[in-house]
């Protein structure tokens, strides 16, 4: 079976596992106050080029979104998201604040879409828009340009909105060949974002970076309140320490993107219809519904939706994948599609 299902289907990158094993017998302080977590935060701050932030490690994307959004918003305040935003479609109602959606453009929200929502919510008989949520990369593997992020940031600042970036796949966004955003840009662009480890070589864990320190007061209370605090916080600390020690975080993501580009080019070569342009490690194709079962017999992948009589299949490249695996997948798809 060729695995193109997702980028979190293995326990962890070998180097992460090696370091976890290395520190097996160490005695650590709990709750994220250990030496590994402290050092991991310093390594992240070095990447950001600033110490003016508050960093917390949480177990996964949904709990990170849940804790942060619940901490900073009042019950009557709402989040603006595109219709395909993860908090809107894949978090089982975890976000209890109302989500105001706008149609996505290639998986992304636009500054104009935000303005339209603001124009429709004008008084206390409606929820009050207070946050803009995006993910980078998006649910469709697309990425935001620096100009797009600057435009969103400008609208947020002009309208007193909190700008929050879901970075579950931030690694692939920052290492995309189409990208012009650096990690050091994020502190000036948004109020908070997180660095995804779960989908970038870690066993689990996300690093939430709160740039707007006015939002971080008593944040550890909220982490505990919502069940997001690790007793063994050093488990995340060791992993992020490893990911940011020698650029492993970027190395993993860059490989995934390169394989994604290769897979897309090979799919085009055999005349498979691409649903959306590939910018990172998620590739979406359109194929006759009757051929899905034959593909899934040999390739682990997900059906993402339908367009008329065609299925949208998502392929995701990962750090343990090799070009030879892609070549085998292409041969199979080509034979099925004849």
Label each region the model flagged.
Residues 13-60, 83-84, 88:
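Conserved N-terminal alpha-helix of the aminotransferase class I/II PLP-enzyme fold
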Residues 52-73, 102-107:
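Conserved core of the PLP fold type I
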Residues 74-76, 261-336:
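Conserved C-terminal alpha-helix-loop-beta "cap" of PLP-dependent enzymes
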């Amino acid at each position: 079976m060729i695995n193109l299902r997702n980028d979190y289907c293995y326990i962890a990158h070998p180097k992460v596992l090696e370091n976890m094993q290395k520190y097996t017998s160490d005695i650590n302080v709990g709750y994220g106050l250990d030496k590994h977590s402290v050092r991991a935060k310093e390594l992240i701050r070095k990447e950001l080029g600033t110490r003016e932030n508050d960093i917390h490690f949480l177990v996964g994307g949904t709990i990170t979104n849940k804790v942060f959004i619940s901490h900073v918003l009042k019950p009557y305040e709402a989040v603006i998201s595109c219709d395909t935003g993860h908090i809107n479609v894949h978090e089982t109602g975890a976000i209890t604040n109302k989500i105001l959606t706008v149609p996505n453009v290639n998986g992304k929200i636009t500054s104009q879409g935000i303005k339209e929502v603001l124009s429709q919510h004008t008084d206390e008989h409606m929820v009050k828009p207070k946050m803009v949520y995006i993910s980078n990369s998006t649910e469709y593997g697309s990425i935001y340009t620096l100009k797009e992020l600057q435009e969103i940031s400008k609208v947020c600042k002009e309208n007193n909105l909190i700008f929050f970036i879901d970075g579950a796949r931030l690694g692939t966004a920052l290492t995309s060949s189409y990208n012009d955003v650096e990690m050091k840009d994020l502190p000036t662009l948004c109020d908070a974002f997180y660095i995804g480890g779960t989908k970038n070589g870690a066993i689990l864990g996300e690093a939430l970076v709160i740039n707007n320190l006015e939002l971080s007061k008593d944040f550890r209370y909220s982490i505990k309140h919502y069940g997001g605090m690790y007793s063994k916080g050093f488990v995340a600390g060791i992993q992020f320490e490893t990911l940011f020690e020698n650029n492993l975080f970027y190395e993993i993501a860059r490989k995934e993107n390169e394989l994604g580009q290769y897979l897309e080019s090979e799919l085009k070569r055999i005349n498979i219809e691409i649903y959306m342009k590939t910018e990172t490690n998620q590739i979406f194709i359109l194929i006759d519904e009757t051929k899905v079962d034959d593909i899934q017999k040999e390739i682990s992948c997900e059906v993402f939706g339908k367009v008329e009589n065609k299925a949208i299949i998502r392929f995701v490249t990962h750090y343990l994948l090799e070009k030879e695996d892609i070549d085998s997948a292409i041969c199979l798809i080509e034979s099925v599609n004849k």
